[in-house]
Curated annotation (Swiss-Prot):
Expressed in brain and testis. It comes from Rattus norvegicus (Rat). This is Disks large-associated protein 1. Keywords: Cell membrane, Membrane, Phosphoprotein, Synapse, Ubl conjugation. The modification Phosphothreonine is found at residues 579, 606. Part of the postsynaptic scaffold in neuronal cells.
Length: 992
């Protein structure tokens, strides 16, 4: 027996005695809680502890067992069992038999804690890796376990006899232990053979191999990180790597490495330096802090966290929360020795354990980490919900360039990510894609940005985060991390909100196609981030955001990166309230002159688009989608502009046709890559959507933006996007299209959230398409009659016009449109005058309207044209600003309204066959046909008419001033919409 113990100690290499000493000291520790300073984790490998227990600490351990509430928590618990069995056999053989039954559970629990390092068990773990998820296999495992238990009982009886013989000696105690161990299923058989071998050669892992397996269990149990990584024993010899990593005993880990060739230094978090590729392979546990497999995965994924740092941190954290934090189920999951190996029946019974067993196969590939049973179970359920497969983690190809930070991040995030619903298999994750693609965006924009800047995050930062995450991961759900790792389906996984969005879009099938495409091409590691935006502003459903990357997000601690400081590869579209959209865009737009597509246009809205890149990509995608193949040939910028509105004028005739087909209050647009856009566009152009859903799939970015109709409608109403787009196209070319157009681009085009014309007054945009070139449809701007109608909407439109397009080009186009329209009216009225024998009063009206229009065009229009030209001339000394132009244009609007009302009246008379209006109208609005009898009445009606016009003008001016004030207020506030909502609404409520 002593030889056996000696061999064991040898096997451990010197650590045994120290372990024994420490064990003896620790025998007093009844709780199995190990503080980081505890000798058990740090000083003793689990197996060394066993040695000490067996040889020297038999008595003390038995005591703690009785006292300890959770014997499994005690290092001594197993010893106690063993000691008890040793003692009991002398006293009562039957009692010994009972002990197995009574203490079997505890013993099982304790075994991992004891960490005798049964390599076989650890190796079994490897075997477990190959186990399939099939219930049959699980059943088989359970059955085998039961057999093993039965067998262990019989063996236990035999061992008891041995124990009786050797009980007095520590060796005897060891022997008893051996019997106990064998009791744990396969351990018995293996330990026996091994014990013999060990007697022959102390260094041989025979006895120890079985112990090591137990140790593997224990180490698994001890090391939450290992558990989190689903520590698979990559190799039987690796079983002890845990001991090193978990115990953080580099020395003992190295010594133990004798039994574990690989374990050598790698097992110790402290010794990560010694990790070799092979070591990593087998003892990747300790080195990567993930299961060796996991670690390999990470290495492949360049997720190789700073091994030393990670290991040390993980070890320390593990030590701090080691044993208690990993549930029994989990450690058993790790330790599954193999189908025949000891897998506590009780644990196996647990569904989570079985699930874990089933899931472990997912980790079979070398690169896939092996989840603990609980982790696996969680992962499984999660997978069922999400279907993403991270099992391809094995193929996870995050380039090393991402640096350990990323690895750490990915590792630490795994759990959070899994919760976030990592869709993407890590393999699909492209480091560049992860960092750069908007998909990588996480729950909230800021977080996404932070994620996008993961590479930017300092390693220190990442490590700190990793530690915190690891703690949370270890304590809360190592399994989730594993889940993230093992998620089986690489395809993008859609959340419920997504389905909602799809329904909204009415593009479900299309969305599915996109999804299938994405899943089929994992390289598009776009986490599908979908934001649903409400009209009140951007309300992101973080739940809607899916991050499909192993490296995705912290669930709890978002990276410290400030939201806007980082590169903003991701598009986050904010639905701006209608009130907000025009003015804030205008403010942004002014600064944004050349950068219509730049994000600044939207910066005001809290959720404004994050990045030009995303915007442009989205714009292109939206462009392709909206315009279909026809628009694709357009320049990406121009296309983006046109895409900004569903009604945006099509730069091509095709687009006009498409728009006419599509005229809807709102359009759901799904934008995909150019390749897909053609197909998608074709189907979408024909379809009408009541709610706006935009799905943008950038190269690797797949997003859906949903705008509430009210928001988009208001926005659309605010801006005649068609004109805006047309002008914006030119302005983009000129790089001088600040104002709402810019915002339009930044928000709508760039976000590829196609703004939808929700409001009826924007029907012009669609209606006038035919009249003008695709580049610009002046008639859309202020339709002749609509101007009269628009008086009610004038404040809004005026504000929007003033706000939206402050560029000289824009105003010139507006001016030209007005001029063309007025000239058309004048020509029509003159023709009517010639062709018809009209009463004098009607002729007078016609002449008045025509004269006023001509005068306005000759004077004010001319002046305004000069102002616009000066605005466009950078050398003009008193160069008017876009605001000046907007103000002057607003003044023109008053005159235009008056004239448009006159022509409107003429049109009504024409519709009435040039007959006077109803008598009431005659009395109110004008004198009856001139009659010499009552010359006095002529002037009175004129006065009344003038008074009506003047009152209307005053009202229009008031509205205009109010609109201007509102616009200025919005300009002054970066969060105009938010403020207006938060401040004004409360006031209204108070009043109510």
């Amino acid at each position: 027996m002593k030889g056996l113990s000696g061999s064991r100690s040898h096997h451990h290499g010197i650590t045994c005695e120290s372990a024994c000493d420490s064990l003896s000291h620790h025998s007093d520790h009844k709780p199995y809680l190990l503080s980081p300073v505890d000798h058990h984790p740090a000083d003793h490998p689990y197996y060394t502890q066993r040695n000490s227990f067996q040889a020297e600490c038999v008595g003390p351990f038995s005591d703690p067992l009785a006292s300890s509430t959770f014997p499994r928590r005690h290092y001594t618990s197993q010893q106690e069992l063993k000691d008890e069995s040793a003692l009991v056999p002398r006293t009562l053989a039957t009692k010994a038999n009972r002990l197995p039954t009574n203490l079997l559970d505890q013993f099982e629990r304790q075994l991992p804690l004891s960490r005798d390092g049964y390599h076989t068990l650890q190796y079994k773990r490897t075997a477990v890796e190959h186990r399939s998820d099939s219930p049959g296999r699980i059943r088989h495992l359970v059955h085998s376990v039961q057999k093993l238990f039965t067998k262990s009982h019989s063996l236990e009886g035999a061992s008891k006899g041995g124990v009786n013989g050797g009980k007095a000696s520590p060796d005897g105690s060891q022997t008893v232990r051996y019997g106990k161990r064998s009791k744990s299923k396969e351990r018995r058989s293996e330990p026996k053979a091994r014990s013999n071998a060990s007697n022959a050669s102390p260094t041989s892992p025979s006895w120890w191999s079985s112990d090591d397996n137990l140790d593997g269990d224990m180490c698994l149990y001890h090391t939450p990180s290992g558990v989190m990584t689903m520590g698979r024993c990559p190799d039987r010899s690796v079983s002890q790597y845990f001991m090193g990593a978990y115990n953080t005993i580099s020395e003992q880990a190295v010594k133990a490495s004798r039994s574990n060739n690989d374990v050598k230094c790698s097992t110790c978090a402290n010794l990560p330096v010694t990790l070799d590729a092979p070591l990593l392979k087998k003892s990747a546990w300790s080195s990567t802090l993930t299961v060796s497999r996991a670690r390999e995965v990470y290495q492949k994924a360049s997720v190789n966290m700073d091994q030393a740092v990670v290991k040390s941190e993980a070890c320390q954290q593990e030590r701090s929360c080691q044993y208690l934090q990993v549930p029994q189920d989990e450690w058993t999951g790790y330790t599954p020795r193999g189908k025949d190996d000891e897998i506590p029946c009780r644990r196996m019974r647990s569904g989570s354990y079985i699930k874990a067993m089933g899931d472990e196969d997912s980790g079979d590939s070398d690169t896939s980490p092996k989840p603990s049973p609980k982790v696996a179970a969680r992962r499984e359920s999660y997978l069922k919900a999400t279907q993403p497969s991270l099992t391809e983690l094995t193929t996870l190809k995050i380039s090393n360039e991402h640096s350990p930070k990323l690895q750490i991040r990915s590792h630490s995030y795994l759990r959070a990510v899994s919760e976030v619903s990592i869709n993407r298999s890590l393999d699909s994750l492209d480091p560049a894609g992860l960092l750069t693609s908007p998909k990588f965006r996480s729950r909230n924009e800021s977080y996404m940005r932070a994620m996008s800047t993961i590479s930017q995050v300092s390693e220190m930062e990442v490590n700190g985060q990793f530690e915190s995450v690891c703690e949370s991961v270890f304590s809360e759900l190592e399994s989730q991390a594993v889940e993230a790792l093992d998620l089986p389906m690489p395809g993008c996984f859609r959340m419920r909100s997504h389905s909602y969005v799809r329904a909204i879009e009415k593009g479900c099938s299309q969305d599915d196609e996109c999804v299938s495409l994405r899943s089929s091409s994992p390289p598009r590691t776009t986490t599908t981030v979908r934001t649903i935006q409400s009209s009140t502003g951007v309300i992101k459903l973080s739940s809607a955001v899916e991050v499909s990357s192993c490296i995705t997000t912290y669930k709890k601690t978002p990276p410290p990166v400030p939201p806007r400081t980082t590169t903003k590869p991701f598009i986050s579209i904010t639905a701006q309230s209608s009130t907000e959209s025009a003015q804030d865009a205008y403010m942004d737009g002014q600064g944004q002159r050349g950068d219509m597509i730049s994000q600044s246009g939207l910066s005001n809205s809290t959720e404004s688009l994050d990045s030009m890149k995303a915007l442009t990509a989205a714009i292109e995608a939206a462009n392709a989608q909206i315009h279909g193949p026809a628009s694709q040939h357009m320049g990406s910028n121009a296309a983006a502009v046109t895409t900004t509105t569903t009604i945006a004028t099509v730069t091509t005739e095709d687009r006009k046709k498409d728009f006419k087909k599509n005229r809807c209050l709102s359009i759901g647009i799904q934008v995909d890559d150019a390749e897909e856009s053609e197909k998608m566009a074709e189907s979408k152009t024909s379809s009408k959507f009541q709610s706006v859903g935009v799905q943008v799939e950038e190269e690797k970015c797949f997003r859906r933006f949903t705008r509430s109709n009210s928001v988009t409608t208001a926005v659309q109403a605010d801006l005649d996007f068609h004109d805006n787009l047309e002008n914006s196209l030119e302005s983009i070319e000129d790089n001088s299209c600040p104002g709402p157009m810019a915002r339009q681009f930044s928000r709508d085009a760039s976000t590829s959230t196609v703004s939808i014309q929700g409001s009826g007054n924007h029907y012009h945009a669609c209606a006038a398409d035919d009249d003008f070139d695709t580049d610009f449809d002046p008639s859309i701007l202020p339709p002749p009659d609509p101007w009269i109608d628009s008086i009610t909407e004038d404040p809004l439109e005026a504000v929007q016009r003033s706000v939206c397009h402050r560029d000289g080009h824009w105003f010139l186009k507006l001016l030209q449109a007005e001029r063309d329209r007025m000239e058309g009216w004048c020509k029509q009225m003159e023709r009517e005058e010639r062709e018809n024998n009209l009463p004098e009063d009607i002729l007078g009206k016609i002449r008045t309207a025509v004269g006023s229009a001509q005068l306005l065009m000759a004077q004010k229009f001319y002046q305004f044209r000069e102002l616009c030209e000066e605005n466009l001339n950078p050398n003009a000394h008193p160069r008017p600003t876009s605001q000046d132009l907007a103000g002057f244009w607003d003044m023109l609007q008053l005159s235009i309204e008056n004239i448009s009302m006159k022509f409107d009246e003429l049109h009504q008379l024409k519709a009435n066959n040039w007959k006077q209006m109803d008598p009431l109208d005659k009395k109110e609005r004008r004198a009856p046909p001139p009659v010499p009898k009552k010359p006095a009445k002529g002037p009175a009606p004129l006065i009344r008419e003038r008074s009506l016009e003047s009152s209307q003008r005053q009202e229009a001016r008031k509205r205009l001033m109010a609109a201007k004030r509102a616009a200025s207020v919005r300009q002054n506030s970066a969060t105009e919409s938010a403020e207006s909502i938060e401040i004004y609404i409360p006031e209204a409520q108070t009043r109510l």
